A protein has these predicted regions:
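Catalytic cores and adjacent flexible loops of soluble metabolic enzymes
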Residues: 1-376
Length: 376
């Protein structure tokens, strides 16, 4: 991730997107409860979360000849779940109040203007709109950070979209998405995360999921593969309103967040540099390293070499305090002090950096076995 610019990191890195969609069912009170319940879970798990709304200019989004249609589920649900601008403003205020980031998917140009009016920090391009160029142009004109979902989108269309936002220097994250509602485990295609990382190396890659059987396994896998933003639909079990199987309840989102923390713990630090080695690990391995012992009595002036080492010295456990190990013995080192058979070869026996440097000397004397260890 070292080639992703700092602005994109600040916006997208380890961001969870909680998609409310139309699960408010046109009721402000239900929308506010969704925000509060899921916001509390995000706060309790110490994660950065955006709660995402969907905006449509219903008066113009639906063709006049089809308004009121009950034969088209998308049209019927859009009309049935309509909220006012004032309602949306109140929801956004609540999103901020619970410590989450306000975010929206605009499905038409007028809705982009509403995003600006309500100061939505991040805009989302739905999979269905990845090549809706009038909409993309309007979204880009806001100069706001953008996340795009890629379900059902061709490679050519994705390349064009990514180039479009790159040319305008607009922060863009790319979500691997399977637009199947709900998705089974065998449909998740998580190897696509690797594909997106390789094809679009300058962007944060995410995973937008509609699975419904598990809230942990795909988090472990997607995090390990390098996804750094995630999205799920959210809802609440309240007042008998049916919950779609691809939507997650607060207790399931809690599992999801905890899986993130576990994945992060298990994967460790940066992938761009060697990890910092914990002292406990080093001390454990030092106890397994062989120390150098004399096969016979040796006098001062004796010079270590590859052949003489085989003839006159041997390696065995335990490595004792102050003793040189198989790691430190080098050709040309000279004994400055006599050593008897089966005695450990220590820092005090030879010349060289480990006897001359206080820091290196302390390193040798602070590791390995000491008789006092048996008393501890």
């Amino acid at each position: 991730m070292s080639n992703i610019n700092q602005q994109a990191r600040d916006v997208f890195l380890n961001l969870f997107i909680l998609e409310m969609a139309n699960n408010h069912w046109g009721r402000l009170d239900r929308a506010l409860k969704i925000v509060r319940d899921h916001g509390a879970v995000a706060r309790h798990n110490n994660v950065r979360a955006a709660i995402k709304l969907q905006f449509r200019d219903v008066d113009h989004f639906i063709h006049s000849a089809f308004k009121g249609s009950t034969n088209h589920r998308y049209i019927e649900k859009t009309e049935a779940t309509r909220l006012t601008r004032a309602d949306y403003a109140r929801i956004v205020k609540e999103i901020v109040a619970v410590g989450c980031v306000p975010m929206a998917t605009p499905f038409d140009e007028a809705s982009v203007d509403l995003c600006v009016e309500l100061d939505m920090r991040i805009l989302k391009v739905a999979s269905s709109d990845a090549n809706d160029w009038p909409l993309l142009e309007r979204i880009a004109s806001t100069r706001r950070a953008v996340i795009v979902s890629t379900g059902g989108t061709s490679e050519k269309d994705l390349d064009d979209l990514v180039t479009f936002f790159e040319n305008r220097n607009i922060p863009l994250a790319i979500n691997h998405c399977i637009a199947i509602y709900p998705s089974d485990d065998g449909e998740l295609e998580l190897n696509q995360i690797d594909y997106f990382k390789q094809r679009y190396p300058g962007h944060v890659i995410g995973f937008s999921t509609h699975e419904y059987r598990d809230w942990q396994a795909s988090m472990y896998i997607s995090y390990a593969k390098g996804a750094r933003t995630w999205e799920r639909h959210i809802d609440i079990d309240h007042e008998g309103v049916a919950v779609s199987p691809y939507c997650s309840l607060p207790e399931q989102i809690d599992q999801w967040f905890k899986a993130f923390h576990k994945a992060r713990e298990m994967c460790g630090g940066t992938q761009d540099a060697r990890r910092v080695l914990p002292r406990r690990e080093i001390e454990y391995l030092d106890a397994l390293v062989r120390g150098v012992y004399a096969k016979r009595d040796l006098e001062p002036g004796y010079v270590l070499s590859g052949q003489s080492f085989k003839d006159d010295l041997y390696l065995a456990i335990p490595l004792q305090r102050g003793q040189l190990s198989c790691r430190e013995v080098m050709n040309g080192e000279r004994l400055v002090k006599a050593i008897v058979a089966d005695q450990p070869l220590t820092v005090d026996h030879i010349d060289g950096p480990y006897s001359e440097s206080r820091t290196l000397r302390d390193l040798i004397f602070n590791r390995g076995y000491a008789p006092s260890d048996d008393e501890a």
